[in-house]
Amino acid sequence: MRECISVHVGQAGVQIGNACWELYCLEHGIQPDGQMPSDKTIGGGDDSFNTFFSETGAGKHVPRAVFVDLEPTVIDEVRTGTYRQLFHPEQLITGKEDAANNYARGHYTIGKELIDLVLDRIRKLADQCTGLQGFLIFHSFGGGTGSGFTSLLMERLSVDYGKKSKLEFSIYPAPQVSTAVVEPYNSILTTHTTLEHSDCAFMVDNEAIYDICRRNLDIERPTYTNLNRLIGQIVSSITASLRFDGALNVDLTEFQTNLVPYPRIHFPLATYAPVISAEKAYHEQLSVAEITNACFEPANQMVKCDPRHGKYMACCLLYRGDVVPKDVNAAIATIKTKRTIQFVDWCPTGFKVGINYQPPTVVPGGDLAKVQRAVCMLSNTTAIAEAWARLDHKFDLMYAKRAFVHWYVGEGMEEGEFSEAREDMAALEKDYEEVGMDSVEGEGEEEEGDEY
């Protein structure tokens, strides 16, 4: 078996975890108490969903997941919520005081008290696996736990499970909707620390999701529940190939092989279509061509950036539902002729396609319409460097005045860590710039200066 263990860190990670597991249960027909009427093999079996769920002798399905937060309130909602019987109590790990939006608390002071317990719980989950393929880690960049504790965990996982792949789903701080002033600090510190430990990181920009909810679903003031359900759909499309049998079954390492040309350039852009409310879906025929075309609209991306200004290094289209290869090939051919999709000159302009015949499921009472087919596009493009540039700029504005730095130093960090992290980010921006340069002509030219 190729099992995956999901780790949900901090408030954002836990709440997205709720949305994801709720959706997985609906997709696989698993009840909130873990029973699965359709599953005839008791205690194990070799079904595809066993990558995400383990089975007990009593026929109960338990998610291979750990929820961690340094303070209890958010996880208490899981402990008392609809799916409280689904999880093993030891899978829900809480500390007593939170990281207070401070990376240093999550990574050094508070985090170190909880890390061994978390790793022990992960080890127990890993022991139940016959062939663990890797970890999916859900967290935000901006929070103290999401940034600090995650980076600590990633470092330790690299030590304990060196060769296993680690994929991140990271919530990028939204420019408009900020929950903390120090988000740029936390984001840059965590990115710097986890850069060498993460194999592939799907960024989700809260603001982009807000806009999609407002524009496509006509929700005037989207709540986190609205956002998380949409994020859940995207995560579900990405992981569907691991949980169902499909024509092209992607395992975790295959994501990296197809999307990551260089180890540091591992931030694919996710785009999902169709995001549409029930009232509209009733009147629209969402063909393969239409939803494929929608994937190339910047409006449907999970991160605010413009791929029309960047170059693509790789592109995967993951379809689910009523889709046949013939339609897909036709849709891609049309897009290649119509759209100005620029690939880097050292990369073949191939689109990798995966098709899963399981149609998309929606949460009852949710905002999304039940559709026959959906597509999730994962593309590695140089345009995502815009997101780093925005963050770096905000970091610079605060760091120039050393604003709020004393909170970090007081928890045992050194100021040098800030400048080191910032230099690493500058190098990352430079890497993206160089990757997008043309290989032959680019040799003789002088490098143009940084845009700061």
From Swiss-Prot:
Mg(2+) binds at E71. PANTHER family: TUBULIN (PTHR11588). A motif (MREC motif) lies at residues 1-4. The keyword Ligase does not apply. The modification Phosphoserine is found at S439. This is Tubulin alpha-1D chain. Tubulin is the major constituent of microtubules, a cylinder consisting of laterally associated linear protofilaments composed of alpha- and beta-tubulin heterodimers. Microtubules grow by the addition of GTP-tubulin dimers to the microtubule end, where a stabilizing cap forms. Below the cap, tubulin dimers are in GDP-bound state, owing to GTPase activity of alpha-tubulin. Some glutamate residues at the C-terminus are polyglycylated, resulting in polyglycine chains on the gamma-carboxyl group. Glycylation is mainly limited to tubulin incorporated into axonemes (cilia and flagella) whereas glutamylation is prevalent in neuronal cells, centrioles, axonemes, and the mitotic spindle. Both modifications can coexist on the same protein on adjacent residues, and lowering polyglycylation levels increases polyglutamylation, and reciprocally. Cilia and flagella glycylation is required for their stability and maintenance. Flagella glycylation controls sperm motility. Some glutamate residues at the C-terminus are polyglutamylated, resulting in polyglutamate chains on the gamma-carboxyl group. Polyglutamylation plays a key role in microtubule severing by spastin (SPAST). SPAST preferentially recognizes and acts on microtubules decorated with short polyglutamate tails: severing activity by SPAST increases as the number of glutamates per tubulin rises from one to eight, but decreases beyond this glutamylation threshold. Glutamylation is also involved in cilia motility. The modification N6-acetyllysine is found at K40. One of its GO terms (molecular function) is hydrolase activity. Pfam families: Tubulin (PF00091), Tubulin_C (PF03953). It is found in: Cytoplasm, Cytoskeleton. It comes from the Eukaryota. The modification 3'-nitrotyrosine is found at Y282, Y452. GO terms for biological process: microtubule cytoskeleton organization; mitotic cell cycle. The active site is at E254. GTP binds at Q11, E71, S140, G144, T145, T179, N206, N228. Signal peptide: none annotated. The record marks Y452 as: Involved in polymerization. Dimer of alpha and beta chains. A typical microtubule is a hollow water-filled tube with an outer diameter of 25 nm and an inner diameter of 15 nM. Alpha-beta heterodimers associate head-to-tail to form protofilaments running lengthwise along the microtubule wall with the beta-tubulin subunit facing the microtubule plus end conferring a structural polarity. Microtubules usually have 13 protofilaments but different protofilament numbers can be found in some organisms and specialized cells. It catalyses: GTP + H2O = GDP + phosphate + H(+). The modification 5-glutamyl polyglutamate is found at E446. GO terms for cellular component: cytoplasm; microtubule. The lineage of its organism: Eukaryota, Metazoa, Chordata, Craniata, Vertebrata. Its EC number is 3.6.5.-. Belongs to the tubulin family.
